[in-house]
């Protein structure tokens, strides 16, 4: 994803766990209300549990590790990372978030081979929809089950992976060309 660089002292782990304003608000209330008998704390704790907040940190650490972060990196200020590592931290946040729609812009840039393999597996088993822009054909082949092509103000849907899309598109274009040639022959025949 093309995200802005982190500022302040937000750690890599905090960046990866900043998944929802509701969760952040519930956590802030929990920290601000030390009294276990407080109704506000009880409500915040219930909301935190509903949002799966108790497993969030463990999940984020697992995802960060999959993206090749070392445990020592988790508490490092995110602003000290290079652009490629910041991108990985944002990818971690997206995977931890588990949105219904995952939008990725050149997500394989800055990933080494091992990390790329892990990331492909995560995206391939993602339960929501994925909208991605990528020049990495191998990545597209491994994750795509359908392609939407936007061309000439039209949207066409193709089922299958990227190679299947290329084959289907070539077949469609060949059919259109054959139909056009037949039409031109008919026109020429009627003009004679």
PLM region spans:
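Short cytosolic helices in intracellular loops of multi-pass membrane proteins
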Residues: 181-192
């Amino acid at each position: 994803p093309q995200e802005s660089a982190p500022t302040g002292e937000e750690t890599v782990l905090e960046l990866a766990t900043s998944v929802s304003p509701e969760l952040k608000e519930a956590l802030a209330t929990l920290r601000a209300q030390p009294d276990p008998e407080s109704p506000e704390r009880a409500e915040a704790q219930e909301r935190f549990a509903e949002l799966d907040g108790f497993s969030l940190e463990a999940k984020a650490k697992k995802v960060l590790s999959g993206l090749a972060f070392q445990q020592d990196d988790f508490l490092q200020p995110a602003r000290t990372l290079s652009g490629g590592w910041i991108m990985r931290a944002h990818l971690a946040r997206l995977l931890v978030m588990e949105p219904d729609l995952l939008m990725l812009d050149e997500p394989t840039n800055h990933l080494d081979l091992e990390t790329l393999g892990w990331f492909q597996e995560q995206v391939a088993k993602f339960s929501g929809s994925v909208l991605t822009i990528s020049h990495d054909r191998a990545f597209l082949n491994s994750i795509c089950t359908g392609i939407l092509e936007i061309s000439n103000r039209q949207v066409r849907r193709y089922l299958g992976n990227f190679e299947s899309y290329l084959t289907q598109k070539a077949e469609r274009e060949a059919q259109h060309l054959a139909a056009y040639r037949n039409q031109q022959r008919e026109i020429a025949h009627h003009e004679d």
